[in-house]
């Protein structure tokens, strides 16, 4: 994970593996841990910040495509694996259109464009 300081116009490496091919450490779904780390990926995973400033990461690709959802807590610098598979190429589980369900899961995605 990298952080850009626009005032200094410099990057700081905040942690994580080097390169796109590190395996990551998934830990237990829903539990934050300083040992958790999403696997390396590229090809435009979706990323956004929520109202409290946490960073979210979904999908991407490095060999396989992924559908895992991660949250990075800025306050303590730890990752939480929130949803999705720890392996690539998941076909997802669609459920009923418009109905939220804990078993629903989007399939793997890469080259994601969003706002």
Question: Which stretches of residues belong to each language-model region?
Answer:
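Kelch-like beta-propeller repeat domains
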Residues: 1-115
């Amino acid at each position: 994970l990298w952080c850009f300081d626009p005032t200094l116009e410099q990057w700081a490496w905040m942690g994580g593996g080097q390169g796109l091919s590190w395996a990551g450490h998934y830990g237990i779904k829903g539990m934050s841990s300083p040992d958790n780390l999403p696997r390396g990926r590229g090809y435009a995973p979706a990323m956004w910040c929520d109202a409290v400033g946490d960073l979210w990461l979904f999908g991407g690709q490095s060999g396989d495509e992924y559908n895992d959802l991660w949250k990075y807590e800025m306050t303590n610098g730890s990752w939480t694996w929130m949803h999705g598979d720890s392996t690539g190429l998941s076909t997802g589980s669609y459920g009923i259109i418009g109905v939220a369900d804990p078993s629903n899961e989007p399939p793997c995605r890469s080259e994601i464009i969003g706002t």
